[in-house]
A protein has these predicted regions:
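Cyclic nucleotide-binding regulatory module and flanking cytosolic helices
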Residues: 1-49, 86-88
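Cyclic-nucleotide recognition modules
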Residues: 75-133, 137
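Phosphate-/nucleic-acid-contacting segments
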Residues: 158-237
Length: 237
């Protein structure tokens, strides 16, 4: 268990002022200081590995670091990209695949609500509503935008969640996740290559120009996090 309220590191390694503790504190920012201090003592921080599966277990789960690709658990259809600060499980969520190493905070739902009180319940309801609206937006996108825009938005989501320019997915992987026919995903990637947005290698996508990718994407994609600004600038240099 951890105690983000006292990050001095005097009694436990978990109390050190590490970036994951700060990420955890920021993720629950809507709660008052007292509610956060009580509720966050209940949970634990769990490391995850790139390429590993994510399976919801009915507890509260929040991404602290890393990028998680969510799917519907049946056909493998894309349901969203989760990154630091995103609530991914509230007594049942979507399974997925980790696209990078990372960290997840988990805590029992009942105990969290008991400690955080009404604030905690409202926080979880707001998180669930955000997930629902995100999935609705993706459904509208799939119905109203072409393959090029959908693929560009998908890649931009992952890039802005990770700050990286290499995505460990093949064209066929992306086509399956977005429910695109083989001819459609091939044509979309060819168009993005011709525009200078990306380069494809075996089993990977290498992003070359974020601005070009954004110009071709539809309106629903993750805003760039200020925390990634320096990393993105350094990687692009």
């Amino acid at each position: 268990m951890l105690d983000p309220a006292t990050p001095s590191g005097e009694t436990s390694p978990c109390l050190e002022p590490r970036e994951e503790i700060l990420s955890l504190w920021r993720a629950f920012d809507p709660l008052s200081f007292e509610s956060r201090s009580r509720a966050l003592r209940l949970g634990e921080i769990i490391p995850v590995v790139s390429g590993g599966p994510y399976r919801p277990d009915g507890e509260i789960a929040v991404v602290l670091d890393g990028c998680l690709l969510l799917d519907d658990g049946k056909r493998g259809t894309h349901c969203g990209v989760a990154a630091a600060g995103d609530l991914i499980d509230i007594a049942g969520g979507s399974p997925g695949l980790w696209l990078s190493n990372g960290l997840v905070y988990r805590a029992p739902v009942a105990a969290f609500c008991r400690e955080a009180g009404e604030e905690g319940v409202q926080f979880l309801l707001a998180g669930g509503l955000k997930r629902l609206k995100s999935m609705e937006a993706r459904l509208r996108c799939a119905m109203s935008h072409g393959a090029v825009s959908r693929v560009a938005s998908f890649l931009l989501d992952i890039h802005r969640a990770t700050g990286g320019f290499e995505i460990a997915l093949s064209q066929s992987n992306i086509g399956a996740l977005l429910s695109l026919r083989r001819s459609s995903i091939n044509q979309a990637c060819q168009s993005l290559r011709a525009a200078g947005a990306l380069r494809t290698v075996r089993g990977r996508i290498l992003l070359k120009d974020e601005a070009v990718l954004a110009s071709l994407a539809c309106c629903h994609y993750r805003p760039r996090s200020p925390a990634f600004a320096e990393a993105i600038a350094a990687e692009a240099a």
